């Protein structure tokens, strides 16, 4: 047990190193349970983490694209930039979220979020969804707490679910930053920057 030991990644099942206090503490508890005659078992870690960098917060859970590619997973992703709470309430801040999911099963694989207030809350919801085995399209159905100072009627996690649902149903087609270079340059594609000044 400890934060410098190899463990099983909850999402991929692969052996990995996740040097975080939470898995180390869980392993310590499991070791103590077994020493005292129990039969606790460690089920792996998904590497949920959060860090403050000046005025920003960055958080992650599960796996990122690099890991998904290395594992040979057929995945897709959505990237969105919702506000942390209702924009008509003063002080709304934009966060950028990336949510990865397996194409065939819609199994949630991971998420990364960068922004101000509310990033920690959303990454914890996504970490719970991954651990509970929810599929990506079910994020839209989560019944999350709402009041204008804290969220929107459609929470950013719900919005990720709506976007995934629209993508899977074929209602939208998405292009990511890395796709821009391969778009036709014959005038058949128009790039339009729809970002707001806040974004």
Give the residues covered by each predicted segment.
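Short polar/charged helix/loop
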Residues: 197-199
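Flexible, glycine/charged-enriched surface loops at secondary-structure junctions
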Residues: 41, 136-140
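Acyltransferase loading domain of fatty acid and polyketide assembly lines
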Residues: 140-158
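Mid-to-C-terminal Rossmann-like scaffold of FAD/NAD(P)H-dependent oxidoreductases
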Residues: 4-117, 152, 156-183, 189
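Charged, low-complexity surface segments at secondary-structure and domain boundaries
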Residues: 111, 124-126, 142-148, 164-168
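Short hydrophobic beta-strand that contains or immediately precedes a catalytic carboxylate
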Residues: 190-195
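A short, polar/charged loop-to-alpha-helix boundary motif
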Residues: 117-136
